[in-house]
Amino acid sequence: MALTVKVITPDRVVWKKTVEEIILPSSTGQLGILMNHAPLLTALDIGVMRARMVNTWVPLVLLGGFAQIDNNLVTIIVSDAEEVKAIDEEEANKLLAASLANMEKAQSNREKIESMQNLRRARARMQAILSLK
């Protein structure tokens, strides 16, 4: 028996797989989930979810949301998610550099918050790409 993981965005099911273990980017840190985990509802931060299928770890970029764990079913509801195979490394590097530059230029509170969110997303994308190397 294993965990069934569903990653859902407002407009589609992004990912549905059976895995042995997942590590979630919760708002309080990394959260590991194995079979028969106690029921749980947790907030998710921007970051990389890692799922272990047999002996392979598969990363998925999550952009904040919630996860519900119950009876070996993990339902993840996020504002957006990206599979690593859909991320272009060169574009991700450019986005990271642009995000860092925008962070330095931000003046208003709104600009600072938006640039911080964009920077966190760019870092998560690069972290996911680098985890495959």
UniProtKB/Swiss-Prot annotation:
Q: Which GO terms describe its molecular function?
A: ATP binding; proton-transporting ATP synthase activity, rotational mechanism
Q: What is its main location?
A: plastid
Subcellular location field: Plastid, Chloroplast thylakoid membrane
Gene Ontology CC terms, in alphabetical order? chloroplast thylakoid membrane; proton-transporting ATP synthase complex
Q: How does it sit in the membrane?
A: Peripheral membrane protein
Q: Which UniProt keywords apply?
A: ATP synthesis, CF(1), Chloroplast, Hydrogen ion transport, Ion transport, Membrane, Plastid, Thylakoid, Transport
Matching entries from InterPro entries are given as: ATP_synth_F1_dsu/esu, ATP_synth_F1_dsu/esu_N, ATPsynth_dsu/esu_N
Q: Entry's Pfam families?
A: ATP-synt_DE_N
Assembly with partners or alone: F-type ATPases have 2 components, CF(1) - the catalytic core - and CF(0) - the membrane proton channel. CF(1) has five subunits: alpha(3), beta(3), gamma(1), delta(1), epsilon(1). CF(0) has three main subunits: a, b and c.
Family assignment from sequence similarity: Belongs to the ATPase epsilon chain family.
Query: What does this gene product do?
Result: Produces ATP from ADP in the presence of a proton gradient across the membrane.
Output this protein's name: ATP synthase epsilon chain, chloroplastic
Q: Which organism is it from?
A: Cyanidium caldarium
